[in-house]
Regions:
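Extended, H/D-rich, highly charged conserved domains that either
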Residues: 15-21, 25, 34-38, 42-47, ...
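Active-site beta->alpha loop and helix N-cap motifs at the rims of alpha/beta catalytic domains
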Residues: 1-16
Length: 230
């Protein structure tokens, strides 16, 4: 049915299990394999500071997912081993960045304790992950993207050598699937070439710019039913 698989790592999944599943897909099933990573790889302090700086200080979360999820010091050696394994098998190994981000339900948004953040607020976190991984692997690791991609940035991601690019949140906004016309026009203007590597400098610049991008800043809605003084 398919010669490529993406392994979505659930929050709290032990690194040993992630690696065993990926090795099985590569060695036994002989499929190109991507591992989908969680934004918690960045650490609590960075995530909190970045979101606060863009006006998302109302989004609440503590550090327990950051402590329980896959850690950077475990992830990087594992990814190097899996890339070497895939090279020996004549297959491709890469990462999909990133999964959604678990945050607390504080205003009765859902009948649960947690919900999952997606969309443009995820973009500065996911591009930072991409920049860190690109630098660690010298741009040689394939990166697939999901984390706030839309018509305003899809061309920049593609130009960095990051693809495939998937998106959902932007299609849930006014315009729906018709937004793909604008996205397609952006990509049609670019030349497609076989993967030659991720441009480390370009993705680092994209991640840095995302932390102060006006299009990503949250603008609070006016308080409903507020009295206006004339």
């Amino acid at each position: 049915v398919c010669n490529c698989a993406t392994l979505s790592t659930l929050h709290g999944c032990p690194p040993q299990e992630i690696e065993r599943i990926a090795r099985y897909l590569i060695e036994e099933k002989k499929v190109h394999t991507f591992i989908k990573c969680n934004p918690t790889l960045l650490g609590y302090e960075f995530a909190r500071k970045t979101l606060d700086g863009l006006g998302y200080d109302y989004i609440q979360f503590d550090d327990h997912h950051f402590r329980e999820d896959l850690q950077w010091e475990d992830a990087v050696p594992m990814f190097h081993r899996l890339q070497a394994l895939a090279d020996r098998e004549g297959l491709e190994f890469g990462l999909k960045l990133s999964n959604t981000f678990p945050v607390d339900v504080k205003a009765g948004e859902l009948p649960s304790e947690e919900m999952y953040m997606a969309g443009k607020s995820l973009f500065p976190l996911t591009t930072t992950m991409a920049a860190m991984m690109a630098k660690e692997f010298g741009g040689k690791l394939r990166l697939s993207y999901a984390g706030g991609a839309d018509a305003f940035n899809v061309d920049k991601l593609f130009s960095c050598g990051i693809w495939p690019i998937t998106m959902a949140t932007t299609e849930l906004k006014p315009g729906g699937y018709q937004r793909f016309t604008q996205i397609g026009d952006k990509l049609d203007a670019l030349d497609f070439k076989p993967f030659q590597g991720v441009d480390v400098t370009a993705v680092e610049a994209l991640a840095q710019a995302a932390r102060s991008d006006l299009s990503l800043i949250h603008i609070s809605e006016p308080t409903r039913h507020a009295q206006i003084s004339y």
